[in-house]
Amino acid sequence: MVNPMVIGYIGSAAAIIGFGSNYVPVKKYPVGNGLSYAFILSIGGLCVAFIAMMIHGTFVFSPIGILGGSLWAMANLLIIPIIKLVGLGLGVLLWSSIGIVVGFFSGKFGWLGLEKQIVTHDWMNWLGFVGIVISIFCFFFIKPSLEDDNNNKNVVDRFKNKKGGYIDPMDNEEFPILRGSVNSDGPIKFNKYNNNNNNGDELETSTETIFDKIPTKFKKVAGISMSIICGVLLGVNMIPMQLWKQNHQEASPFDIIFSQFAGVFLFNAFTFMFYAMIKKSPQIYPKTVFPSFISGVMWGIANCGLMISTQNLGYTVGYPISCSGPMIISSLWSVFYFHEIKGTKNLLILCGSFLFLISGIILLAFSSF
């Protein structure tokens, strides 16, 4: 029989890789305001939950699990705006760190009905928390480079033909992964560009989004504010499941996993349907559907890994490892692939942030031993 500790670390590895990479498949595809992306992502996650439920052989459908999934879905709707405003690396660093802090206080003080967690070395517990707070403060000084996203606002001009009309850059082989999205204020038909007359005087849609309209000097403030809200929601989204487990001591996290994932799906489904009824021309990009589904599958596997890790390694070990590791992975993507974080100053700040963050996580993890 496999050692539970080994299973726990395998779960942590799945969570770290999955959470740190699950937004990469859609990073260079147009997602508009993110509503259709979130809906398709939830379908991918629900498929993973269904498979996990079948493997585990149990099924529990609890309203409290639906609540937890809905809290996560609310946070997820903020992900696309955050990535557009401050980049993938900095965004994940912020909301993940804040989520860890919120989770720390929730367990430390027994917020929202949770049982207070008593640790062996309280001083180490608090010192670890301070290390995380310092790392979050350091993240504010990182200035990601998002020139590629800003340049996409004018990309449509490169597709203007001699007759004044426009062709769809999504269909052009030169730009197979165009990041620009459609103006949410105008009607759209699968991101097609149409002119209202033969002279091409007016364009029905553009690649500009509401996020592109935010003045540059306010983008970072808006992105950081959304990251804080997102982090809080992520930090409390597992509390409903923990409350359920307090009343079912012998239960496995997999017993309620389908309810948690169903909450994510139902919230996104209702949100997207409401948006479609109000907007009447929702932003749907055919080429983004499959990457969104893959993103959802990766998230679903990562979330299952988090549950396995927490169950086998404990909340003070499995949870910090699984929630801090993705920040490193996402930053590596941001530095080496997307080139959002570059420059000696930014890289030094990033390394310093990691030093405090990793030290804090280690102290938190070992404070109960």
Curated annotation (Swiss-Prot):
The keyword Nucleus does not apply. It is a multi-pass membrane protein. It holds the Pfam family TMEM144. It comes from the Eukaryota. Keywords: Membrane, Transmembrane, Transmembrane helix. GO terms for molecular function: carbohydrate transmembrane transporter activity. One of its GO terms (cellular component) is membrane. The chain crosses the membrane at residues 6-26, 35-55, 63-83, 85-105, 122-142, 221-241, 256-276, 288-308, 318-338, 347-367. This is Transmembrane protein 144 homolog A.
